[in-house]
Regions:
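The feature marks the mature, well-folded catalytic cores of soluble enzymes
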Residues: 2-378
Length: 378
């Protein structure tokens, strides 16, 4: 089967209806009125795709966020998992509590309202359609798709409990017209937690949470393959972006994009990061690390013999706009300190969705779909 115009422009002994109606045969119409249009995908995105689908920043004003409403998947907790070894324990479901679905939905509604109250458009991911439903970690939407320079990349999840989140995420984005500009394929793996835009020209990528088998050569190569795919997609769009592929086979990277409050500014003790990464951030972006006082810091056990315990500053949650953050309730000292350094703090009550009750943070539960550009005046 030929495409439009492929053979129809060839001369024919038959009556040429194009020539008869317009004075020009089809070939002449192509040549005169229909040249190829040389244009840039990113530059014409708003015209062709309806919106500026860009979120390659973690501090530009948030315009659209992707959330997932807890559903029937949480009723499966306590039953044998649909994946091997088909264990009914809470640990096998990566849960610390038997979920109360009504309570989780209430917390989700609190979170959605908090965004809407700040003028953020809320996009809800399509529900889990597996039989039985099992996607109890789908509330962490930041892990499944991630911004490229424009549009979204569908990532490829690590483990059974998160497999197949990719499809409803893709369908949700497609339904609202958000361009999916790539997917992680083959045996490549990548999750969004440790993929972080530090600004529009710098992004770091590492392993999300190392497992018992992460150090196996085949798994290491699969992780690297996924990271390289992400980097290629980004650099095809914008060759100027510096993508740092960070090693991730022991301690987790202390992700600076989870500690941001403003452009090139994070609440972090740089001694908790790889010194080479710190040197790069300072040299490339003149990065400012603000060290919080001990009384508002959180203590973490790293399982790294070189630094078993680290202190991290108060959670900065989701940056709504520069110097304005959305965080869970419950840390009045941290809020007061953040306000003392000029950060506006918006709080939301959502304990069943975030730590310590659950396995992710409020940042994990927010997929950035549209953000304004970062301020360039400082």
């Amino acid at each position: 089967m030929s495409s439009e115009g492929e053979f129809q422009t060839d001369s024919s002994d038959e009556v040429d209806s194009f020539k008869k109606s317009t004075g020009l045969d089809l070939h002449e119409q192509y040549m005169k009125f229909h040249p190829q249009v040389l244009s840039d995908f990113g530059e014409e995105m708003e015209k062709m795709w309806g919106r500026k689908w860009r979120a390659n920043t973690n501090v530009g004003k948030l315009r659209m966020v992707l959330l997932h409403c807890p559903g029937k998947e949480f009723l499966s907790v306590g039953k044998p998992t649909p994946w091997p070894p088909h264990d009914p324990s809470l640990a096998a479901w990566r849960m610390a509590f038997k979920p109360d679905l009504d309570e989780m939905i209430r917390d989700h509604e609190n979170l959605a309202k908090a965004y809407r109250d700040e003028g953020v458009e809320v996009l809800i991911r399509k529900p889990d359609t597996n039989d039985p439903p099992y996607q109890v970690k789908a509330i962490y939407t930041d892990d499944v798709c991630h911004p490229a320079s424009y549009g979204q990349i569908i990532l490829r999840m690590y483990d059974h409990v998160r497999k197949r989140e990719e499809l409803p995420t893709y369908q949700t984005l497609a339904e609202v017209g958000c361009p999916v500009v790539g997917m992680i394929v083959g045996n490549g793996m990548a999750e969004g937690g440790p993929i972080g835009w530090l600004d529009e020209k710098h992004v770091v990528v590492s392993v999300h949470y190392p497992r018992a088998n992460t150090q196996q050569p085949a798994v290491m190569r699969a992780n690297e393959f996924g990271h390289e795919q992400f980097a290629r997609i980004v650099k095809l769009q914008d060759p100027e972006v510096d993508v740092r592929l960070c090693p991730g086979y022991g301690t987790r990277l202390g992700p600076s994009h989870y500690a941001l409050i403003d452009r090139h500014t994070s609440i972090q003790d740089p001694r908790s990061l790889d010194p080479n990464l710190v040197a790069w951030m300072k040299a490339e972006m003149d990065w400012e690390f603000i060290i919080a006082p001990d009384e508002v810091c959180r203590t973490f056990v790293t399982r790294d013999e070189r630094r078993l315990v680290v202190k991290r500053g108060p959670e900065t949650g989701v940056v709504l706009e520069p110097r304005k953050v959305l965080v869970p309730t419950g840390e009045p000292k941290a809020r007061k300190w953040l306000e003392s350094i000029g950060v506006e703090v918006v709080e939301v009550n959502c304990p069943t969705l975030v730590g310590p009750m659950n396995s992710g943070s409020i940042h994990c539960a927010a997929g950035s779909i549209i953000r304004d550009p970062e301020p360039k005046s400082y």
